[in-house]
Amino acid sequence: MAQRERNREERGREERDSEFVDKLVHINRVAKVVKGGRRFGFAALIVVGDQKGRVGFGHGKAREVPEAIRKATEAAKRDMIFVPLRSGRTLHHDVEGRHGAGKVLLRAAPAGKGIIAGGPMRAVFETLGVQDVVAKSLGSSNPYNMVRATFDALKHQMHPKDIAAQRGIKYSTLQARRHDVVGSEE
């Protein structure tokens, strides 16, 4: 009886979680040295998102790969952030992020450009729901640092309405200035 209830709860949890897309970024075999020798385990880095502007990453360690992935997925769902997207497909402005020796540059891109980004950053953008972006990784190519640097950059992403409110100007004035600058560059 208890088993049936647990299965029903798990099925309900899976249906709720089906809104999220998860990507395995990196899996690593780790060793714990003990008196009798080495104990091997696995560490997983997962990125989870709803493809509508919410994304999170998690790290999990366990003796078996599936358990490490499950732990990482749970951690990613706990620590999700919201990123405002322009037209639901790209970033509002160019931004830079850092973590440790990792540095990333993210640039908004015109429609049809696609996701031009390397490994770990691509997984973040695909789960976030970004369709057009150009990203460059500088410094460390460690997947953990790259993901954290990408999240640092995304946390600094602001909607133009928030920028206008901070500056004490109207949103329409900010948009007009943007179109003047963009128009003069072309």
From Swiss-Prot:
InterPro entries: Ribosomal_Su5_D2-typ_SF, Ribosomal_uS5, Ribosomal_uS5_bac-type, Ribosomal_uS5_C, Ribosomal_uS5_N, Ribosomal_uS5_N_CS, Ribsml_uS5_D2-typ_fold_subgr
Free-text domain note: The N-terminal domain interacts with the head of the 30S subunit; the C-terminal domain interacts with the body and contacts protein S4. The interaction surface between S4 and S5 is involved in control of translational fidelity.
Protein name: Small ribosomal subunit protein uS5
Keyword terms: Ribonucleoprotein, Ribosomal protein, RNA-binding, rRNA-binding
Similarity-based family: Belongs to the universal ribosomal protein uS5 family.
Assembly, per entry: Part of the 30S ribosomal subunit. Contacts proteins S4 and S8.
Pfam families the record matches: Ribosomal_S5 (PF00333), Ribosomal_S5_C (PF03719)
Superkingdom of origin: Bacteria
Domain S5 DRBM, residue spans: 20-83
Record-linked SUPFAM superfamilies: dsRNA-binding domain-like, Ribosomal protein S5 domain 2-like
Function, as annotated: With S4 and S12 plays an important role in translational accuracy.
One biological process term in Gene Ontology: translation
Gene3D superfamilies per the UniProt record, alphabetical: 3.30.160.20, 3.30.230.10
UniProt-recorded Gene Ontology molecular function terms: rRNA binding; structural constituent of ribosome
Keyword field contains Ribonucleoprotein: yes
Keyword Ribonucleoprotein: yes
GO CC terms of this entry: small ribosomal subunit
